[in-house]
From Swiss-Prot:
Keywords: Isoprene biosynthesis, Nucleotidyltransferase, Transferase. InterPro entries: IspD, IspD/TarI, IspD/TarI_cytidylyltransf_bact, ISPD_synthase_CS, Nucleotide-diphossugar_trans. It comes from Salmonella typhimurium (strain LT2 / SGSC1412 / ATCC 700720). Its EC number is 2.7.7.60. The record marks 157, 213 as: Positions MEP for the nucleophilic attack. This is 2-C-methyl-D-erythritol 4-phosphate cytidylyltransferase. Pathway: Isoprenoid biosynthesis; isopentenyl diphosphate biosynthesis via DXP pathway; isopentenyl diphosphate from 1-deoxy-D-xylulose 5-phosphate: step 2/6.
Length: 236
């Protein structure tokens, strides 16, 4: 049986720019309330007692991170990220070589709920592979004609899930799978896809659909609404 209740390290790839936000400032440094999106995302991880360290992979030319309180936080380590997400995650994993389990969380996903995080972390009691937070697809899904704004066909939504983060895996397994997948030229869109490529089947842990990733300008107001609602609920 897998080890239980071990301390967990987290990796947050934050070297991207996010051009779809249509701003000069990288999206992770946009503010919601009195904190940046990155700060909201990291603090949600550190709020759980099992998460003892967070490694943030930033762009080598990043001058904004040093201005944040996170830069002096005793549980934060900063590493240089790479050109692609997988490169940044690997850099983060190298910084926590002794960790047994690691979370990987999007820098621009600030609305993580603690009950979702707790359910995800609990899978380490019985799993040797790990899993991800995910939300069942509820809308009707259409596949488009290649290169056209026209419907090709309807996709059966049964058993379809939206992949969320955090994603949670044994550190050595994730490192080995990412390294192999990249070396063999596989397309890696998230950490789970690297494990899938290597023949593993991570668990799906249902999470809240409001755990959104801020990708487009309209997402900022929505994330602010969700965060404000959560704060009010916690104070009630």
């Amino acid at each position: 049986m897998a080890a239980t209740l071990l301390d967990v390290c987290a990796v947050v790839p934050a070297a991207g720019f996010g051009r779809r936000m249509q701003t000069e400032c990288p999206k992770q440094y946009l503010s919601i309330g009195n904190k940046t999106i990155l700060e909201h995302s990291v603090h949600a991880l550190l709020a759980h007692p099992r998460v003892t360290r967070v490694v943030i992979a930033i762009s080598p030319g990043d001058h904004r991170f040093a201005q944040l309180p996170l830069a002096n936080h005793p549980q934060i380590t900063v590493v240089d990220g790479g050109n692609e997400r997988a490169d940044s995650v690997l850099a983060g994993l190298q910084a926590v070589a002794k960790a047994q389990w690691v979370l990987v969380h999007d820098a621009a996903r600030p609305c993580l709920h603690q009950d979702d995080l707790a359910r995800l972390l609990a899978i380490s009691e019985n799993s040797r592979v790990g899993g991800i937070l995910a939300s069942p697809v509820r809308d009707t899904m259409k596949r488009g004609e290649p290169g056209k704004n026209a419907i090709a066909h309807t996709v059966e939504r049964a058993d379809l899930w939206h992949a969320l983060t955090p994603q949670f895996f044994p550190r050595e397994l994730l490192y080995d799978c990412l390294t192999r997948a990249l070396n063999e030229g596989a397309t890696i869109t998230d950490e789970a896809s690297a494990l899938e490529y290597c023949g593993f089947h991570p668990a799906l842990v249902e999470g809240r659909a409001d755990n959104i990733k801020v990708t487009r300008p309209e997402d900022l107001a929505l994330a602010e609404f969700y965060l404000t609602r959560t704060i009010h609920q916690e104070k009630a």
